[in-house]
Amino acid sequence: MKQKFSILLFLLLLWFTGSQAVAQNAPNPFDIEQPSLRVFLPAPELATGRAVVACPGGGYSHLAVDHEGYDWAPYFNKQGIALIVLKYRMPNGDRTLPISDAEAAMKIVRDSADVWNLNPRDIGIMGSSAGGHLASTIATHAKPELRPDFQILFYPVITMDKSYTHMGSHNSLLGKDASAELEKEYSNEKQVTKETPRAFIVYSDDDKAVPPANGVNYYLALNKNGVPAVLHIYPSGGHGWGIREGFLYKDEMLNELTSWLRSFKVPRKDAVRVACIGNSITYGARIKNRDRDSYPSVLSRM
């Protein structure tokens, strides 16, 4: 890998108090009590301005940071894409911890766009297994300024429905006695809107840990809402293969991902956003779902 920069940022994420994340001394690399970002930038001559924030899996109890995180850097950097790997905190009874870490990561990457030569309107999120649940949660729940522009999901946990979720992830995030309302809130196939970003979703048909029905239902919800999405289910491979050589369909998967990443246009980095100032019609008074369908809301997404 022609890696020009590898920057290790350690974050104090007091997200809900509005505190600014700052660099800290390096903790133990296996410490998941303190979140961190590791940034891999492509060579300047290859850089496209695109970036991906990676959320490794681990059932919300540990993190597979290598084959679902750092080991992806050569692939993305070769495509001219920056890779930012997030080591997020485990919930340990507080589901807001990993979610706030991922939201803060999106904010930091966008705020650092000029420094890292990124397009702030071309920042995606990637997640594997439970990290896929975290990534799809940010894609479906986050405020517009924190929402990714696209999502890449490998064998993701999508639902919290006990009939087909990954129970380890469910219990670590929500607890064994989670209410039906809470399970619905974090069943991301039920939270898709027209504003949810486009998605690339991959499973193996013989995945016994996370049933592919998680991704099928998410794809159907995206499709119903007019969100571009692709779903690939390979005949075998089980669960947790990441970018390991042992995955039989690795080459096909990478070719599909490369083609997908090249398939959609990106707003220019210097594109101007236009705001409307006007009467109640312009603002969207009496328009159902005005946060989504009013003129200012529509223009903000252009």
Feature names for model-found ranges:
Residues 48-57:
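Short beta-strand element of the alpha/beta-hydrolase
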Residues 104-169, 183:
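Primarily recognizes the serine-hydrolase "nucleophile elbow" in alpha/beta-hydrolase
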Residues 266-302:
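Serine-esterase "nucleophile elbow" of acetyl-processing enzymes
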Residues 40, 216-268, 282:
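C-terminal catalytic histidine-bearing segment of alpha/beta-hydrolase fold enzymes
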Residues 195, 200-203, 207:
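Short beta-strand/loop motif that positions the catalytic acidic residue
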Residues 208-214:
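Conserved alpha/beta-hydrolase "acid-adjacent" motif
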Residues 64-73, 84-120, 244-252:
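Catalytic nucleophile-loop/oxyanion-hole region of alpha/beta-hydrolase
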Residues 26-29, 156-191, 197:
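Mobile cap/lid helix-loop segments that gate and shape the active-site cleft of serine hydrolases
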